[in-house]
């Protein structure tokens, strides 16, 4: 499912909301999650999961084409840990 399909699904299930309102809500939710992660905050959606930022150390990698050693700088990456309810639904418990 892509963002536009999510917006359409929510709009279809909530006829009192226009598609433009739903789009604004979905975009705001995503933007707030992104801003919180950029500040280094953790975002927890109970039952669904938690978004956080993890630090990756610098390392020596390899260029797959040439096999040459390449320095990979340290960086921050987004991380998602699933919640128990989501795991249980995926595993049909």
UniProtKB/Swiss-Prot annotation:
Any one Gene Ontology molecular-function term assigned to this protein's record: structural constituent of chromatin
BP GO annotations: DNA recombination; regulation of DNA-templated transcription; regulation of translation
Keyword Transcription regulation: yes
Keyword Transcription regulation in annotation: yes
Bilayer-crossing regions: none
Keyword line: DNA recombination, DNA-binding, Transcription, Transcription regulation, Translation regulation
A Pfam family assignment: Bac_DNA_binding
Disulfide bond sites: none
SUPFAM superfamilies associated with the record: IHF-like DNA-binding proteins
Top-rank taxon: Bacteria
Family matches, as CDD domains: IHF_B
GO cellular component, one term: cytosol
InterPro entries: Hist_DNA-bd, Histone-like_DNA-bd_CS, IHF-like_DNA-bd_dom_sf, IHF_beta
NCBIfam families per UniProt: hip, PRK00199.1
Subunit organization: Heterodimer of an alpha and a beta chain.
Matching HAMAP family: IHF_beta
Family according to the record: Belongs to the bacterial histone-like protein family.
Its biological purpose: This protein is one of the two subunits of integration host factor, a specific DNA-binding protein that functions in genetic recombination as well as in transcriptional and translational control.
Name of the molecule in the record: Integration host factor subunit beta
Native organism: Cereibacter sphaeroides (strain ATCC 17023 / DSM 158 / JCM 6121 / CCUG 31486 / LMG 2827 / NBRC 12203 / NCIMB 8253 / ATH 2.4.1.)
């Amino acid at each position: 499912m892509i963002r536009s399909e999510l917006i359409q699904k929510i709009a279809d299930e909530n006829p009192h909301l226009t598609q433009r309102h739903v789009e604004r809500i979905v975009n705001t939710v995503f933007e707030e999650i992104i801003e919180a992660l950029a500040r280094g905050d953790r975002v927890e959606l109970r039952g669904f999961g938690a978004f956080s930022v993890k630090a990756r150390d610098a390392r020596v990698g390899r260029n797959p084409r040439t096999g040459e050693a390449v320095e990979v700088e340290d960086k921050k990456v987004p991380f998602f840990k699933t919640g128990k309810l989501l795991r249980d639904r995926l595993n049909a418990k």
